[in-house]
């Protein structure tokens, strides 16, 4: 660690001359994704970046890097509705808005809100529900802006420790906050939250910080200490290493999800709510792994 006393001249010059060269550099995210559908088939299963009923996107704009995940609510399948259509369309709309520059980096809730209302105004009714988590890195300010609705989420790791994480939003056990579009005759009887209900946060990040964004299929099956163990294997900041680590994390969560004797975070949460449950939670799993790096064109 640099000593202020030892490097007083350097610090003084930086103050006198304005921002240092390090502070003036733009940041970016080196990001990779991996996931599993609940039906055991791994990889991208449907149009766009979808793993089962989960969906995600990674988008780059000159002002920011933006990524997101959404978990389609599977209960719609009982009514003949494909849950992946809602989550997939929501994420593709968010991605398009970013690429078109129709967003403000400091306002990820705005991305979610605009995308959701585009879906509401769709001429062809799109029924369904999903959770959503949006993460934005502002290149120049080096700040991360987040919006999380429901039980998907993110965590930021620095020096092997979790320094920031999203708060899970639940109405009650296993019923997360969610965006919904219901048929007119069912409006009022389908649980639906406003994008403005998303939990928002903003904070500075540093070069080398690791950002993991995922659906509940990961967090319900892997506690933080297991995730941190996998992240220790990440030695390089290139795409290949990031992709391999994302794959390793998703694969471990997938194995644990089908272990009947494993006391998963979901099982522990169920026990805390008076239910006698043990084992992993079979679910779609989506992992986006990102490393904060210096921006290059």
From Swiss-Prot:
The record's annotation in SMART domains points to: PP2C_SIG, PP2Cc
- Pfam family name, one: SpoIIE
Report the record's Gene Ontology biological process terms.
regulation of ubiquinone biosynthetic process
Look up the EC number in the record and give it: 3.1.3.16
Question: Which residues are listed for Mn(2+) 1 binding in this entry?
Answer: 71-72
Domain of life where this protein originates:
Eukaryota
What is the extent of the transit peptide? Answer: 1-27
Entry keyword set: Hydrolase, Magnesium, Manganese, Metal-binding, Mitochondrion, Protein phosphatase, Transit peptide
Coiled-coil region(s) at which residues?
none
Q: What's noted on cofactor binding?
A: Binds 2 magnesium or manganese ions per subunit.
Q: Which molecular function terms from Gene Ontology are attached?
A: metal ion binding; protein serine/threonine phosphatase activity
* Domain PPM-type phosphatase intervals: 28-292
Q: Provide the catalytic activity annotation.
A: O-phospho-L-seryl-[protein] + H2O = L-seryl-[protein] + phosphate; O-phospho-L-threonyl-[protein] + H2O = L-threonyl-[protein] + phosphate
Q: Which cofactor does it need?
A: Mg(2+); Mn(2+)
In terms of PROSITE patterns, this protein maps to: PPM_2
Its cellular-component GO annotations read: mitochondrial matrix; mitochondrion
InterPro entries in the record? PPM-type-like_dom_sf, PPM-type_phosphatase-like_dom, PPTC7
Q: Briefly, what is this protein's role?
A: Protein phosphatase which positively regulates biosynthesis of the ubiquinone, coenzyme Q. Dephosphorylates the ubiquinone biosynthesis protein coq7 which is likely to lead to its activation.
Name the record gives this protein: Protein phosphatase PTC7 homolog
The record lists the organism as: Danio rerio
């Amino acid at each position: 660690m640099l000593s202020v006393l030892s490097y007083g001249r350097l610090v003084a010059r930086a103050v006198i001359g304005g921002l240092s060269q390090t502070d003036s550099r733009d940041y970016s995210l080196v990001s990779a994704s991996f996931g599993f559908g609940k039906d055991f088939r791994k990889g991208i299963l449907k149009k766009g970046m979808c793993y089962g009923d989960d969906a995600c996107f990674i988008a780059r704009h000159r002002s920011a890097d933006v990524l997101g995940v959404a978990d389609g609510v599977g209960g719609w399948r009982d009514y003949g509705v494909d849950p992946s259509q809602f989550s997939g369309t929501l994420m593709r709309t968010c991605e398009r808005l970013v690429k078109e520059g129709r967003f403000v980096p400091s306002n990820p809730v705005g991305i979610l809100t605009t995308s959701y209302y585009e879906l509401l105004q769709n001429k062809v009714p799109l029924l369904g529900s999903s959770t959503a988590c949006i993460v934005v890195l502002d290149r120049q300010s080096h700040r991360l802006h987040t919006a999380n609705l429901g039980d998907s989420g993110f965590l930021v790791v620095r020096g092997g420790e979790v320094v920031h994480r999203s708060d899970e939003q639940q109405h009650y056990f296993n019923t997360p906050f969610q965006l919904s579009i219901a048929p007119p005759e069912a409006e009022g009887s389908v649980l639906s939250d406003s994008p403005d209900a998303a939990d928002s946060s903003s904070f500075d990040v540093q070069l080398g910080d690791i950002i993991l964004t995922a659906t509940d299929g990961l967090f319900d099956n892997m506690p933080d200490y297991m995730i941190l163990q996998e992240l220790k294997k990440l030695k390089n900041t290139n795409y290949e290493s990031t992709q391999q680590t994302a794959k390793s994390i998703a694969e471990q969560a997938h194995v644990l999800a089908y272990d009947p004797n494993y006391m998963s975070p979901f099982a522990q949460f169920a026990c805390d709510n008076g239910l006698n449950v043990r084992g992993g939670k079979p679910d779609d799993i989506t992992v986006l792994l990102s490393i904060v790096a210096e921006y290059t064109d």
